[in-house]
Amino acid sequence: MAATALFRSIRRRDVVSAPLSVYKSLAGNAQPSWGSSYIGQNYASFSRAFGSKPVVNDILGTGLGTNNAIREEREKSKSTEAAIVGAQLTRSFRALDVGTSKRLFSTISGDIKTTQEEPKIKSFRPLSPHLSVYQPQMNSMLSIFNRISGVYLTGVTFAGYLLYLKMGMICLTYPSFYQVLYHTQQQLPVITSVTALAAIYHTIKSTHSLLTH
């Protein structure tokens, strides 16, 4: 087999080199010119195509090699891209897990702190919206008593007007009216003293308010 392959290769070289030797001998005997040199170059390129090394096999081999290299590069790039994406996903998942765990622990600790805190002492609301301290003061108490005394004096005056000036003239024939009047007269010293005290206090407080304000 080796001998037959060697014989075939020698025959191919003889066939290819025969026209080239003939061409060289003819070109040496002939006169050189621009056209003959151009034709000789074309013939040389044509004969080189049928040389000992098969051009088709070289082209096919080169093409297959480049295609394989391109495929390998694409596969490598895809594998690197997949590795990068996987690394980014793992980092994001780790960050998400850490963030959720931190939030969970923070909420638990916040609940524990709120449960362990002592209740704050609630202060009393002010009796007047103009006060800055939430506790009863003398000014507010005096103002409240002044208003109460004014209302009391108004009620006593209106009740006396109705009982002694109007209802007596109308209800002279009703015995129940005289009973109410009799019981009212028994409480009259207490009512009179309270009314006098309220009148004095209201007068003094009103005068003081007018002078100061």
From Swiss-Prot:
The lineage of its organism: Eukaryota, Viridiplantae, Streptophyta, Embryophyta, Tracheophyta. PANTHER family: SUCCINATE DEHYDROGENASE CYTOCHROME B560 SUBUNIT, SUCCINATE DEHYDROGENASE CYTOCHROME B560 SUBUNIT, MITOCHONDRIAL. It is found in: Mitochondrion inner membrane. The gene is SDH3-1. SUPFAM superfamilies: Fumarate reductase respiratory complex transmembrane subunits. Pathway: Carbohydrate metabolism; tricarboxylic acid cycle. It comes from the Eukaryota. The chain crosses the membrane at residues 148-165. Heme binds at H130. Keywords: Electron transport, Heme, Iron, Membrane, Metal-binding, Mitochondrion, Mitochondrion inner membrane, Transit peptide, Transmembrane, Transmembrane helix, Transport, Tricarboxylic acid cycle. Membrane-anchoring subunit of succinate dehydrogenase (SDH). It is a single-pass membrane protein. Gene3D superfamilies: Fumarate reductase/succinate dehydrogenase, transmembrane subunit (1.20.1300.10). This is Succinate dehydrogenase subunit 3-1, mitochondrial. One of its GO terms (biological process) is tricarboxylic acid cycle. Component of complex II composed of eight subunits in plants: four classical SDH subunits SDH1, SDH2, SDH3 and SDH4 (a flavoprotein (FP), an iron-sulfur protein (IP), and a cytochrome b composed of a large and a small subunit.), as well as four subunits unknown in mitochondria from bacteria and heterotrophic eukaryotes. It holds the Pfam family Sdh_cyt.
